[in-house]
Curated annotation (Swiss-Prot):
Stated family: Belongs to the WD repeat TAF5 family.
PANTHER family named among the record's database cross-references: TRANSCRIPTION INITIATION FACTOR TFIID, TRANSCRIPTION INITIATION FACTOR TFIID SUBUNIT TAF73
Gene: taf73
Main location: nucleus
Gene Ontology CC annotations of this record: cytosol; SAGA complex; transcription factor TFIID complex
Domain LisH: start-end pairs: 11-43
Matching Gene3D superfamilies: TFIID subunit TAF5, NTD2 domain, YVTN repeat-like/Quinoprotein amine dehydrogenase
UniProt-recorded name of the protein: Transcription initiation factor TFIID subunit taf73
WD repeats: 347-386, 401-440, 443-482, 485-526, 528-566, 569-608
Gene Ontology biological-process entries: transcription initiation at RNA polymerase II promoter
Keyword annotations: Nucleus, Repeat, Transcription, Transcription regulation, WD repeat
């Protein structure tokens, strides 16, 4: 029997080297690369053995750029997951360069790429910037934290295989540096789908699409360094002003005079008929309540964005809002059940891409794949005429001008104008009266996915495939602000009620909130595990709802930046969200053809006997929900297509 050529005292690392040498000599280079990554589970390699593929200083810069550019070019399905690896590679490349006694190259590397990680890891980036020489890596706490603790990342098998394939193909370009850093300092957890208690490698692609449905499996272990505080929490604690926009004294005086006349008219009719027509509070009382609410939040009210002078039509519009609020329903578990007034477009052959209702519930607009926009208006002059008038014919008109499919439409608060955005890269402002284009806005260099008027109608925002959102006003053809920070398509936008902030949802799985006055990010929410498909701000300005392509809905408290509640019911992408005007109900709908009403007083930590947060589930006749909108009177309008 042949004697073994290896002594029993050989260490695990020596055996690993022997296996790697054997694989290299036999030509199994891909297997070699995978082994280098997967042996990371045995623990950190001692410093004296960390000599494999050290690389020249310049190679660190080249290979980091190579990795970053490769990730940017991957499919959107994998990009958000692969981007997680860039930060720990950045940190350890910087520390390596310091330990190589090349502080000049280390500082160049750090300053060149730090901006990519400032938002999510700002605290640690600022701490790492204090390192100047090799001895700092051994002495300063933040460096030792990263060197002695592995950075945890959760990958699916297909994502991991893509990374390994890239590293294998680029070993001649220096990817061995990345392989070494992954092996020594990064703990990649491979999560596989479970099928009857067993792994099923044949469903990997399906699992990528449904990854968020297995959320508990994937995120059961926190990513990053265990026990190290999440830097995003500190970033999201910066002060923001969520108060509502106060009314000028002149406007309040004019409003009160008008409302007193209307209240006296109602009282006179009540006396004549010997009954109460309006049991609700009168309009002056409602205005006083609203003033008090605004005054309570005065310290949180932002400086007013510049707006055109208030006109009489603006005051009339505000009066109509108060009248709607006066007659609004009270919804909830112990109050009135919600109702849905559904408008369905039949036999569209998937031609309807988007829809929007007017603020007064008198008209809606459709954006279509044939590049046209269709307007449907009620001939009824009463309040919210689209509610309860199913047998009434609607007036239809078409707007023609775009050259590619239309993906977003929005109707101004006073329904004078319609905005549309298209794959052709342009946004158009249309006149409702003349049915013609007033302004054509150019700025994006890619398809535009969404557009929305601000609550005051003068400003609007767009979201685009070029990874930016932009702020515009109706009077200028060039953007006022460009919001840059997302790492993938910006898919949806939603204004805060005070118009000082804008929320954006992206295919990079994050939701951001921007200050429209400065163009800077003030909040980042990254709890979704698939592209964000819908957003909605609550009427009080304190909550933001976001939904993703997996059907998961999250509601965020904007003051604390904490997740208020999470809802799981939809089986596919959610296209539309809407808060009731009393901020107690959230309605959602999408491709699974269901309309769901959620109780916002619910909390995730169910107590004994507490019911489900789902108040009602309405099923359609297999029609896709394109848009949902609560009216000012808390009725729900919906538009679907088949």
């Amino acid at each position: 029997m042949a004697q073994s050529s290896y002594s029993s005292g050989n260490s695990t690392s020596d055996l690993n080297k022997i296996v790697l040498d054997y694989l290299f000599k036999k030509g199994y280079s891909r297997t070699e690369a995978m082994l280098r990554l997967e042996i990371s589970s045995v623990g950190a390699i001692p410093e004296e053995q960390q000599d494999w593929h050290i690389g020249a200083s310049e190679t660190y810069v080249q290979v980091y750029i190579l990795l970053r550019d490769w990730i940017d070019g991957t499919l959107d399905l994998y990009k958000p997951k692969l981007q997680k690896v860039l930060y720990p590679i950045f940190v350890h490349s910087y520390l390596d360069l310091l330990q190589k006694n090349d502080p000049e190259m280390a500082i160049y590397f750090f300053e060149s790429f730090r901006i990519e990680h400032e938002v999510l890891h700002g605290y640690d980036i600022r701490a790492l910037a204090q390192l100047k020489i090799a001895s700092d890596v051994e002495e300063i706490e933040i460096a030792q934290l990263y060197r002695k603790n592995k950075y945890r990342i959760n990958f699916t098998r297909s994502t991991f295989d893509l990374l390994v394939q890239f590293l294998f193909e680029n070993e001649v370009n220096g990817s061995g540096i990345i392989i070494r850093l992954l092996n020594q300092y990064i703990d990649i957890k491979i999560t596989m789908p479970q099928v009857e208690g067993k792994e099923d490698p044949n469903v990997q692609a399906v699992y990528e699409m449904d990854e968020a449905k297995n959320e508990q499996t994937i995120i059961s272990e926190q990513e990053g360094i265990p026990g190290h505080s999440e830097q995003l929490l500190d970033y999201n604690k910066q002060s923001i002003q969520l108060g509502l926009r106060p009314l000028s004294e002149e406007v309040v005086t004019t409003l009160k005079n008008l409302l007193e006349v209307k209240d006296k008219d109602v009282e006179g009719r009540n006396e004549a008929l010997n009954k109460i027509l309006h049991p609700a509070k009168n309009l002056v009382e409602l205005l006083t309540e609203k003033e008090n609410l605004i005054n309570e939040s005065t310290l949180e009210s932002p400086s007013d964005p510049p707006l055109p002078p208030t006109k009489m039509k603006d005051i009339d519009y505000f009066v109509s809002l108060l009248e709607s609020e006066q007659n609004s329903l009270i919804l909830g578990k112990n109050a009135t059940d919600p109702s849905v007034f559904m408008y369905t477009m039949h036999n569209t052959l998937s031609a309807v891409n988007c829809a929007a209702f007017s603020d007064d519930a008198s008209m809606f607009a459709l954006g279509c794949a044939d590049s046209s926009i269709h307007l449907y208006s009620s001939t009824n002059n009463g309040p919210q005429p689209l509610v309860g008038s199913q047998n009434e014919p609607l007036q239809k008109s078409s707007l023609i001008g775009h050259t590619r499919p239309v993906f977003g439409v929005s109707i101004s608060p006073q329904k004078e104008f319609i905005l549309s955005c298209s794959e052709d890269g342009f946004t158009r402002l249309w006149s409702k009266d003349t049915k013609s284009t007033i302004v054509k806005y150019a700025g994006h260099n890619a398809p535009i996915w969404d557009v929305q008027f601000s609550p005051f109608g003068y400003y609007f925002a767009t979201a685009s495939h070029d990874q930016t959102a932009r702020l515009w006003d109706v009077e200028h053809a060039a953007p006022l602000r460009v919001f840059v920070g997302h790492q993938n398509d910006v898919d949806c936008v939603s204004f805060h009620p005070n118009a000082a902030y804008l929320a954006t949802g992206s295919s990079d799985h994050t939701t951001r909130m921007w200050d429209v006055r400065t163009g800077g990010t003030v909040r980042v929410f990254n709890a979704h595990h698939s592209p964000v498909s819908a957003l909605c701000m609550s009427a009080d300005g304190l909550s933001l709802a976001s939904a993703d392509e997996s059907g998961i809905i999250k509601v965020w408290d904007l003051r604390s930046s904490n997740q208020h509640v999470s809802f799981v019911k939809h089986s596919s992408i959610v296209y539309s969200l809407s808060f009731s005007y009393d901020n107690k109900i959230l309605v959602s709908g999408g491709a699974d053809t269901d309309v769901n009403f959620w109780d916002l007083t619910y909390r995730n930590n169910l107590s004994d006997g507490e019911q489900s947060p789902l108040l009602f589930n309405f099923k359609t006749k297999n029609t896709i929900i394109q848009n949902l909108s609560f009216t000012r009177r808390n009725y729900c309008l919906a538009l679907s297509s088949s």
